[in-house]
């Protein structure tokens, strides 16, 4: 188990190849700058388990009978990274980064293992919003995080044996609007989606980093950022398809939006929701994007033309009202969509919340919502 001692992060990061199957249906092999995908192992690994005895999953505290539920009894969650046969999930208020591993349907969910922890200000909607692995993670073991501090929102880099290093600072902090997202879209380019800190005027101000999509090249301590998109409201997520397009979700006072950033940096609005279902995390594929919905308690599947990326039909909903309010989303290597719930702060928590869930791949295309 990893520890944090006197502000220094201890990580145990072992790496290996992950064989990824599937193609179009939200397969993270198409949307990741990692080749092959890394895996993350905690310190002091547990001995191999004996094959489970077939039967029903036992009952008890923090044991969810739903076979799709991977982890239970988490604090409210932030970002989520699928790693093939496991995942990393951030706890927004505690600053912990946890590894979660699925088990067979007859076994109780395993207790998540802490991989790292960073100090955050988790008040309001701030804290540890998102995480991303370095594209050279196999060599350097670095994790990037979007966090709220006592003075600002910022991007930091976490390495074994040292304190987090500031990569991008000065993103405005407010009572609300602190959530942000980070995504490596190439091995040397990170996109940073920032909230408006509850101040819509910051989103259109050239002097503010708030309410923007920012580009950071070769992220390192003291990096500067280039503004790619202005006018972001409450930041949802940014997710790339690994080829030529990046999707952005955000919430405004009048509508929730799904925007498309093309390879030439032009931005178009792909879809809007006047009923404001609470767009949050997203997972992209070459022919669409899955969006976690907080208020609507579902995953929206927006099918896009693989050539033009146009969304022409109303996104369909899956897993509606099954797991409560959803935040983070990530693409699994087998076509599944990993999601993390945010019921402890945004919804009505049940006895197993908050949770990480693997949702089976959707069958068919879009439809009415």
Locate the predicted segments by residue:
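Sequence/structural signature of beta-propeller domains
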Residues: 2-369
């Amino acid at each position: 188990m990893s520890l944090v001692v006197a502000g220094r992060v201890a990580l145990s990061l072992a790496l290996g190849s992950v064989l990824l199957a599937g193609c179009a249906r939200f397969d993270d092999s198409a949307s990741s700058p990692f080749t092959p995908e890394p895996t993350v192992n905690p310190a002091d690994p547990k001995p191999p388990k004996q094959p489970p005895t077939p039967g029903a999953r036992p009952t008890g505290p923090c044991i969810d009978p739903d076979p799709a539920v991977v982890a239970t009894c988490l604090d409210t969650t932030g970002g989520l990274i699928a790693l093939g046969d496991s995942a990393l999930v951030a706890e927004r208020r505690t600053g912990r980064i946890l590894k979660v591993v699925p088990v067979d349907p007859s076994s109780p969910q395993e207790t998540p293992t802490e991989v790292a922890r960073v100090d955050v200000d988790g008040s309001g909607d701030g804290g540890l919003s998102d995480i991303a692995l370095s594209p050279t993670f196999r060599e350097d073991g670095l994790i990037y995080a979007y966090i709220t501090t006592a003075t600002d929102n910022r991007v930091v880099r976490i390495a074994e044996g040292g304190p987090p290093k500031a990569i991008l600072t000065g993103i405005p902090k407010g009572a609300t609007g602190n959530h942000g997202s980070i995504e490596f879209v190439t091995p040397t380019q990170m996109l940073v989606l920032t909230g408006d800190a509850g101040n819509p005027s910051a989103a259109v101000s050239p002097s503010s980093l708030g309410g923007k999509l920012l580009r950071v090249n070769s992220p390192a301590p003291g990096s500067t950022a280039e503004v790619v998109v202005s006018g972001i409201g409450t930041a949802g997520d940014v997710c790339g398809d690994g080829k030529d397009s990046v999707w952005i979700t955000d919430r405004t006072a009048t509508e929730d939006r799904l925007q498309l950033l093309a390879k030439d940096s032009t931005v178009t609005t792909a879809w809007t929701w006047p009923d404001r279902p609470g767009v949050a995390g997203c997972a992209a594929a070459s022919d669409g994007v899955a969006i976690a919905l907080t208020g609507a308690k579902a995953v929206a599947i927006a099918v896009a033309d693989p050539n033009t990326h146009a969304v022409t039909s109303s996104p369909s909903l899956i897993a509606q009202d099954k797991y409560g309010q959803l935040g983070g989303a990530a693409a699994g290597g087998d076509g599944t969509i990993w999601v993390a719930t945010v019921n402890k702060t945004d919804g009505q928590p049940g006895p197993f919340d908050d949770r990480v869930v693997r949702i089976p791949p959707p069958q068919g295309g879009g439809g009415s919502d």
